[in-house]
């Protein structure tokens, strides 16, 4: 039985800009996970992403640990370890400059370690991928009602 199959309830997570459906998923044994359900068209991309997360975890980087990846009736799913806490977006401004700087240094060290992994072979030029990502973010920003 997969972890996905042992989920007994879900609570929607309404954060982020992706169109994926996100949930805090609960299992009968009391464990909980971050569940992301995406369209099947994203299968290959998300499979690579899950593999990269496993590689990053193997480096000792703290992240929501990748637990399971698969296909369900709703699309392709990714299950990550749930980490309780608060969003840095709300917490960082309440910290003094020294603490903010310390977190920035730690994040930089983590990124340096992540960048030690070999880069995947791109299927298209970086500039095209980046422009497409920016265009999507700009469109989402413009559509945001705030």
What are these regions (language model features)?
Residues 1-6:
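Juxta-kinase regulatory segment immediately upstream of eukaryotic protein kinase catalytic domains
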Residues 112, 125-146:
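Active-site catalytic-loop/activation-segment of kinase and kinase-like phosphoryl-transfer enzymes
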Residues 12-128:
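ATP-binding pocket architecture of kinase catalytic cores
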